[in-house]
Design a protein with these regions (language model features):
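FAD-dinucleotide binding site
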Residues: 2-284
Length: 284
């Protein structure tokens, strides 16, 4: 039997997940008295932005976050090196339209700068500096281009060149695990082709830390921190969200937690989600 590989486009279309978000219920209209119009779960960038937009639309909203801070994977640490250091998300793509870049540019507290080109980096193999003669970028471009141009729903490992090259394992880690979060055997060339064709500008960085920028951008957004969601009951009209601080009733629930949280089973769904959705949490 042919193995099916995960495609984020297909995942978003079939599981109602956009920006890692699920909505419950999708069609049900509630006539009951509810605590809120919408309960947003997760105060990462997606959850915070959704909360802001819903408030602007006149909705009664509550945003719940299990940890003690907002920002999700956008988190700046100032203790490790004595300088701002992003432990998660650290650059901004699509500078012409990126709202975080616009916020940073319009706020004197932040200094944004373009990422330096690859020629500005020094690469080492052990204690030996890698020179241009090593053709590491040729290998990178060859592997990346081959995956992107394949346009088929097959695993990259079936088509990528340079598999005997000394830099193949490095590129496997870079293009596979680092860029896509999966090994070459576990995602689709068709999916990578979609990402590859999206026009992007040079990445931008924030001297003060991208995590800090996100926290400042949404510092007035109302969020209930240290509130862990245990169960989402969407069996009736509206939804009931059970947390470690009590129950919350709403017309709709918007979930923006990571796929890691969804696949861990930490949040119970009643009734259970479809097998297709459950499997997609583990494959994406």
């Amino acid at each position: 039997m042919k193995k099916k590989y995960s495609s984020r486009r297909k995942f978003i279309k079939t599981s109602l997940l956009g920006l890692t978000a699920i909505t419950f219920p999708n069609i049900i209209k509630s006539n009951e008295n509810q605590d809120y119009d919408v309960v947003v779960i997760g105060a990462g960038a997606a959850g915070l932005a959704a909360t802001e937009e819903l408030i602007k639309a006149g909705k009664k909203v509550i945003c719940l976050e299990a940890s003690e801070r907002i920002g999700g994977r956008a988190f700046t640490d100032n203790q490790i090196f004595g300088e701002p250091y992003d432990l998660g998300a650290l650059w901004l793509d699509n500078g012409e339209t990126n709202p975080f870049k616009k916020f940073g540019e319009n706020n004197s507290n932040f200094n944004l700068y373009k990422e330096r080109s690859e020629e500005m980096y020094n690469l080492y193999s052990g204690n030996k500096k890698i020179t241009k003669e090593d053709n590491i970028w040729k290998v990178y471009d060859g592997i990346q281009g081959t995956i992107a141009k394949t346009r088929k729903d097959i695993a990259p490992i079936e088509v990528v060149p340079y598999q005997d090259n000394r830099w193949f394992d490095t590129m496997h880690m870079t293009i596979g695990a680092w860029e896509m979060g999966k090994d070459f055997s576990d995602y689709s060339c068709k999916d990578y082709n979609f990402d590859y064709e999206i026009r992007e500008s040079d990445p931008w960085h924030c001297k003060e830390g991208f995590g800090y920028l996100v926290s400042e951008m949404f510092k007035t957004t109302p969020v209930k921190l240290n509130t862990k969601v245990k169960e989402i009951d969407w069996s009736g009209s509206g939804v009931k969200v059970t947390t470690d601080k009590g129950d919350i009733k709403a017309k709709t629930c918007l979930i923006t937690v990571s796929n890691g949280v969804l696949s861990s089973g930490e949040i119970k769904f009643t009734p259970k989600l479809s097998i297709e959705k459950e499997e997609s949490f583990h494959k994406i």
